[in-house]
Structures are given as structure tokens and as C-alpha cells.
UniProtKB/Swiss-Prot annotation:
Gene Ontology process terms (BP): DNA recombination; double-strand break repair
One Pfam family named in its UniProt record: RecO_N
The protein's name: DNA repair protein RecO
Coiled-coil residue windows: none
Function per UniProt: Involved in DNA repair and RecF pathway recombination.
Keywords per UniProt: DNA damage, DNA recombination, DNA repair
Subunit structure, interactors included: Monomer.
Length: 242
């Protein structure tokens, strides 16, 4: 654990007069809680680097739940997120902080996270496809495997012209009932391919990931979503979060 690890800061808060408490996501150790001693002092060279969306190399150690940051280096400047992409980045940071246990390795998820924020930084349109792909990847790494290609129970291949109802922990079954848990075969095929060519498939992906993530998030609302509603134009909020 004392070696260098690639990492990103998910969240930070003041800890004593001169230190920071960090929630970080690392390549080898997963989510880790760190104390950065002296990081808030005027002479500290760390404060500017220990920011969300800055690719970092960290070295830390300690025996308790809270580790001590030994060294930190910024690999590059922070990825340029602003406006809706900034709130989207804060959302995925909060999502990881809420659903990942401490010190559980998720190396592949680390690169899914990196790819997501890189996509957000280079996005000139909607961030929704990148967010949906990341949510689906996260669910997969958490062990929430869903078969989008075959009907639960019968095992029949999903038909693009039929409708299917989602049942938690089971999958999708053919259904003639249309409600919030119903998806078309076309939508399921888009979810499986992680490709969302139109607004219909994006809305379906959001419906599914919200349902699937709900057990992990519980009843506590996401702070990033509330911040988005407060500070972004109402039309944008409706488009991206409703």
C-alpha cells in the first residue's frame, strides 16, 4: 500500500486547521479515506493538486480505516469540466462514494471512471451517453448482472418488436402491460450494446439505471442532483435529470 497508485479525489473536506480529509478512488486499493496532513497550510504544495478530476499519483499508508497521505503528484492538469459536465462529474463522484465499500479493489472500474470523465471533458453535446455507460459498468462491477439479450425464465432471445417488464433480481420477461418497468426489445438491445442513438433509448437507459441503482443508494437523495437543480437552467434540468 506504500507504493505509488493512480488515483482521483472524489471528495474533500477540512480536517483540523491545516489538514484535509480525502475520499479517493485508486486503481489498486479502490476507495480509500486519507488524511492529508498540512494540506491546508499556506506553505503546502498539495492543496492545488488534491482536487476532483485531477489525475494523481498517491502514496499512502497506515493500519486504521483512515490512512495517511505520504506523497502526492499531479500527473496532469485537472480535466476541464464546466457547467453541465461539471455537475455530471460531481454526480459520478458522489455515486462512487455512496456505493463502493472502502478498500475493495475495482481496477477495471477505475478505468471506466477515467474514460467517463475524459468523455465528459471532451463532450460538446449531451453528457447522458457517457453517464449511462458508466452507470451500467458500475452495476456490472457491483455484481448486478442483467441479461438484456434473453428473456428471463424462457430463455428466448429478446425480440425488438416486443415489450418486456423488468423484475428485480430476475431480469426481463415478455409483457403486454405498459408501465415504468416496461421496455421495448429495441431499447434492451441498445442497453446491451451501450449505444444510445436517440432520445428514446437514452430515456430508457436512465429509467433502468435509476431502478437498478436505487437499492444501493437507499432513500437519501443525491446532493449533486440537488445542486444541479439549484444552479442550472430549468430547461437543462428537465432535459438531463427528469
Amino acid at each position: 500500500m506504500e507504493g505509488w497508485q493512480r488515483a482521483f479525489v472524489l471528495h474533500s473536506r477540512p480536517w483540523s486547521e491545516t489538514s484535509l480529509m480525502l475520499d479517493v478512488f485508486t486503481e489498486e486499493s479502490g476507495r480509500v479515506r486519507l488524511v492529508a496532513k498540512g494540506a491546508r497550510s499556506k506553505r503546502s504544495t498539495l492543496k492545488g493538486a488534491l482536487q476532483p478530476f485531477t489525475p494523481l499519483l498517491l502514496r499512502f499508508g497506515g493500519r486504521g480505516e483512515v490512512k495517511t497521505l505520504r506523497s502526492a503528484e499531479a500527473v496532469s492538469l485537472a480535466l476541464p469540466l464546466s457547467g453541465i459536465t461539471l455537475y455530471s462529474g460531481l454526480y459520478i463522484n458522489e455515486l462512487l462514494s455512496r456505493v463502493l465499500e472502502y478498500e475493495t479493489r475495482f481496477s477495471e472500474l477505475f478505468f471506466d471512471y477515467l474514460h467517463c470523465i475524459q468523455s465528459l471533458a471532451g463532450d460538446t453535446g449531451t453528457p447522458e451517453p457517457a453517464l449511462r455507460r458508466f452507470e451500467l459498468a458500475l452495476l456490472g462491477h457491483l455484481g448486478y448482472g442483467v441479461n438484456f439479450t434473453h428473456c428471463a425464465g424462457s430463455g428466448e432471445p429478446v425480440d425488438g418488436t416486443m415489450t418486456y417488464r423488468y423484475r428485480e433480481e430476475k431480469g426481463f420477461i415478455a409483457s403486454v402491460v405498459i408501465d415504468n418497468k416496461t421496455f421495448t426489445g429495441r431499447q434492451l438491445k441498445a442497453l446491451n450494446a451501450r449505444e444510445f442513438p436517440d432520445a428514446d433509448t437514452l430515456r430508457a437507459a436512465k429509467r433502468f439505471t435509476r431502478m437498478a441503482l436505487k437499492p444501493y443508494l437507499g432513500g437519501k437523495p443525491l446532493k449533486s442532483r440537488e445542486l444541479f437543480r439549484q444552479f442550472m437552467p430549468k430547461r437543462t434540468v428537465k432535459t438531463h435529470y427528469e
